[in-house]
Amino acid sequence: MLFRSTAPYSQAVKVGNTVYLAGVCGDDPKTDKIVGNGDIKIETKYALENLKNTVEAAGGTLKDIVKVNVFVKDIKMMADFNEVYSSYFPENPPARIAMQITDLAGGANLEIDAVAVL
């Protein structure tokens, strides 16, 4: 299930064989609420499932993702984030940056955006 934003942006934009995926958080697309009560592993799993659903809706898979940007409220969360992330990208993971930011919408602890080449 894809998240339906009320904000003026697309979840994904396809240009040729490149897909630009908008940022996703660890929210349940059925309720639009952040999950996990602060548990970064649960929130990461939901965010990556949301990313997976979006890239699949665009005709790709997680293996097509070539670049990921990760935004976290606390860089110390990255060890737990990486544990979950590695299960989604076990071999040849995409290029990636991770950065700490001050705040995210809806009380999220992380947001992930990506670029895929189909």
Model regions and ranges:
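Short, polar/acidic, helix-capping and beta-turn segments at strand->helix junctions
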Residues: 1-118
